[in-house]
Regions:
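Acidic di-acidic motifs
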Residues: 8-9, 54
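Alpha4 helix (beta4-alpha4-beta5 surface) of REC/receiver domains from two-component response regulators
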Residues: 63-67, 71, 78, 91-108
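C-terminal output helix
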Residues: 95, 112-123
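Two-component/phosphorelay signaling modules centered on CheY-like receiver
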Residues: 11-30
């Protein structure tokens, strides 16, 4: 079974996405900010096959930061360079999408259509 690391600071969004991914047959490990995402990944790196990270959440200093997900992306890629990563955002920001992909993300996904996220993950994992 595929294991997904899901990191989002909004509890309701985290729960909704987690339920969607569980129903789709994935194992899901959750975290709520950059430090917990990094630590959770470090403890489970061998089994995590893809990460889904919120773009805007508390950064490593605990303060909310626009683009903090890109910082976490960089940290995860240091630990596992070939890790596929999807960056989530509530905002359809083309420039941030380009930043995410340039920073090593596999894709960028605008929150709100959970089933679309499942389809995107399936597509990425199939290569």
């Amino acid at each position: 079974m595929t294991t997904v690391l899901l990191v989002d600071d909004e509890k309701l969004v985290l729960r909704s996405l987690e339920k969607t991914l569980l129903r789709a047959g994935y194992d899901v490990i959750t975290a709520h900010d950059c430090p917990s995402g990094r630590d959770t990944f470090a403890q489970n790196a061998a089994k995590i096959e893809i990460a889904v990270l919120d773009l805007n959440m508390p950064s490593f200093d605990g303060m909310p930061k626009t683009g903090a997900g890109l910082d976490l992306l960089a940290e995860l890629k240091k630990q596992k360079a070939d890790l596929p990563v999807v960056i989530l955002t509530a905002y359809d920001e083309v420039n941030k999408a380009k930043d995410a992909v340039a920073g090593g993300a596999s894709a960028f996904f605008v929150k709100g259509r959970e089933q679309g996220l499942v389809e995107l993950i399936q597509k990425i994992l199939k290569g």
